[in-house]
Amino acid sequence: MDKELFKEEQRFDQLWLKVPLYILAIGNVVLFAYGFYHQLIVGEPWGDNPMSDIGLVFATGLVFLIWGAVFFLFEKTKLITSIYDKEIRIRFPPFFSKEKTIPIQMIKKMEVRKYNPITEFGGWGLRYGFRGKAYNVKGNIGLQLNFKNGKNLLIGTQKGEQVKWAISKMVRAD
């Protein structure tokens, strides 16, 4: 039985990210709800060049659907990292719900490092950059894995010191 040394679950819960999204969503929904009400309930065309009633129903539904999907993704997306004595396991639902297992034998080098998510990977999330793949949701600290096959993976963490401790125990367990 593998011994779990570390586990972390991270979500996209940054206020600087949520506030603009909520403002945009509320603005879009209110605008289309007003247009829907004005044209279909009151009976007056909405705007200088109004779309058909069917087009407005479709567009309003699409706006609600898109924003619903965005908020669903933000609510359900989480990065789950587990470090065991002989492997690292990662899940990033809804992008991949099946656990990815990385045996220690595949890893050439691993270290906790500071990184720049924007310049190195183009932001947060499931990212691809010149230095390899990154799974991150916030911050600028990550577990850098360099594989024996030449590929690289960075896993973001908010608990760098705990990850350092876990990988030191992991290496000793091999």
In which residue ranges do the predicted regions lie?
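Glycine-centered small-residue hotspots that permit tight backbone geometry or close packing
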Residues: 43, 124-125, 156
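Short N-terminal helix-initiation segments at or just after the protein's N-terminus
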Residues: 16-28, 48-57, 85-97, 152, ...
